[in-house]
């Protein structure tokens, strides 16, 4: 068996089929499995998707939220087994693929217009 075929088989079994369609500007709620000692629990991280990067099994997305007045960004591998679930809370209308400019905006200026789907 050649390496390309082996690589394709391994990646196909790692792919998640239940990933919802979301784009930068959308507000998502990511359920992440967190291991603390011997326990495993689900932690929810909700924020705006500021970018999607890569493709295939190595695709990642970055979510930004404001927590106690401080901006927090977290990058997640899309097909990671640590990501239990992704919910789309709100669909936003933006005209860019990378929303890095949100890092410099504060308060109401950082809002994104919502669209109905």
Swiss-Prot record:
Instruction: Please name the GO terms of the biological process aspect recorded for this protein, alphabetically.
Output: translation
The Gene Ontology terms for molecular function here are: structural constituent of ribosome
Task: Print the keywords alphabetically.
Answer: Ribonucleoprotein, Ribosomal protein
Q: Give the UniProt entry's GO cellular component terms.
A: cytosolic large ribosomal subunit
Judging by the UniProt lineage, the source's domain of life is: Bacteria
What family does this belong to? Belongs to the bacterial ribosomal protein bL19 family.
Briefly state the protein's biological role.
Answer: This protein is located at the 30S-50S ribosomal subunit interface and may play a role in the structure and function of the aminoacyl-tRNA binding site.
Q: What is this protein called?
A: Large ribosomal subunit protein bL19
């Amino acid at each position: 068996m050649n390496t390309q075929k082996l690589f394709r088989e391994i990646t196909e079994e790692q792919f998640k089929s239940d990933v919802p369609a979301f784009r930068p500007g959308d507000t998502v709620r990511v359920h992440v499995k967190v291991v603390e000692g011997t326990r495993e629990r689900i932690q929810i991280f909700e924020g705006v998707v500021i970018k999607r990067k890569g493709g295939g099994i190595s695709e990642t997305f970055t979510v930004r939220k404001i927590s106690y007045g401080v901006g927090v960004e977290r990058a997640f591998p899309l097909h990671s087994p640590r990501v239990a679930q992704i919910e789309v809370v709100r669909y936003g209308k933006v005209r860019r693929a990378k929303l890095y400019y949100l890092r410099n905006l504060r308060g109401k200026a950082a809002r994104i217009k919502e669209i109905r789907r």
